[in-house]
């Protein structure tokens, strides 16, 4: 028991002396049950040369054992024999730590960061781990910032006697190995030896361990800095590309927060345009020569060799934009470098790193945006075509603030404004979608009703059109569908003059007779010029390229001027449309007959007089909408509202709707010839046209008044009044709006007809 206590006291006092020598504390007292080992008097190193020569072989062997401290494993029974060995008196005074210089340049080697065998397990904490040690007599002193570099105890001072009561090992530091298992393991060669270390050996061991510890600290910090830099670079990439956040979970004490990161500027983007797209510029030798001094590649580019014509040609794999790292810097106080030189070199390295990485990052971003410029939204491409945008400067951040409702070169909208506008746009799109759906359904219903009405029309034709019941059905059908082209001419002819052709045979000059007169007469040149001016004014200036002017139009107008009725208002327009309509099959005889028939029945002098009188003064319905409305105060006169301005409206109608309008006007001027007393046998030379017109021709001026009222109330745009409508020089102006799409054209036309029917019922 006494031997065990004596050994424990010996180990405790040896550790106390070691602490005292490293912390500049002397004259420490040992435990009451042990004896202390006093340090020799202070001597110069030259006094110990002869004395230490005899111990050279033993010291060299112990020195090698200390270097290979972590590479040997032995039984734990050697600890006791190492502690009970003879202690050689100290005969050499160690030099101060301030004069210790780095003996191996590998300490700051650039490869130390990436050495796979190096780890942070050698970073340890030499705190008080022995619960049985008596340290009450040691004077405490605050540790300075060089704590890890200067606090090195003797190997013996950290040992414990295995035969004594075991003391629990200190709690290991997370991420590092337990120093207790390293230096108190049974395989420790120093604990295995029978002779204790001299103070000189302890000093050499202290230097070895200091270098090893410093190397491990630098490697660990550099490795942590490299890993954290990769995380920061990843965060920069994600923020620019995907707007994602990367959390950095590393030790904050191992990061250098003042290292500038690479950035992409507009100027560098514009100035970084290069023609070398196949091989990166940093691979070329000319570019490599311009690299800043001191920078090196964290991971060199990967090269492979391909065989071309028997030669090996290197092919390069592009590097990362951040594939640049700082060189290792000297440690002030350890390396032989002044503080000014250290700060100057570090500043140059940081500046070079920033410029180099920024240039590479700009080139990478420029190449990426050049490849993806074709995938940008259409508004950016249109702005680029107009010189208002550079596609290389469009980033994800700018795209997030750009909307289709505002050009990209204007200031961006406020987020609340964007949200409000998107909501309104969504509502309008919903309304348009519903409207389009309803219109499509309506067009499908129109196609179906058109087939049904054709069957009904064929039924009343077989039964007889001039019956009252047939005329009633026909007036219902005509507001839904126009007459078919193959039936239009026959229906018009039977409704206006019955199947006996009472008017054309008795009151209209035949086409052949007028043509014979024209062929035997030299037509006056002045009259021909007047007709040509009429065509230019009322036809050519109104329709543009919709319908070509036929050569037969001038010929038919010349014939009409030679007839008894002569040229009247609307002749040129009726001839022009009938020549191209499929219903007449390009028959000039039918065109001649039908134009004269319509002018004698639907647009005769009696209808004209009624229209001019009722539109200004007489009709109550027209006066209710127009006469009492202050907006039409300047138009409610005979100059703007007359029979001539009615044809100004018809001149602006498209061909299809013009024929449908004539269908409606003609059918509403029909009469029942079946119950009429007049017949082919009753007509003789004594019954003049005036007598026949008074007794047998229906004059429906109300259909014309309702038509004019519709234009004034619903389509009065693009002109000031109806008299100025003929002077409008826009050839594309049409009432209603013309469209080349069949569905749209039917929609506009059917809407116009429904509104006309609504106002006609008011009369």
From Swiss-Prot:
It is found in: Golgi apparatus. The keyword Secreted does not apply. The keyword Ribonucleoprotein does not apply. GO terms for cellular component: Golgi apparatus. Keywords: Cell wall biogenesis/degradation, Golgi apparatus, Protein transport, Transport. It comes from the Eukaryota. It holds the Pfam family SBE2_M. Residues 18-36 have a biased composition (Low complexity). One of its GO terms (biological process) is fungal-type cell wall organization. Residues 18-48 are annotated as: Disordered. With SBE22, is involved in cell wall integrity and polarity processes like bud growth. Belongs to the SBE2 family. This is Protein SBE2. The gene is SBE2.
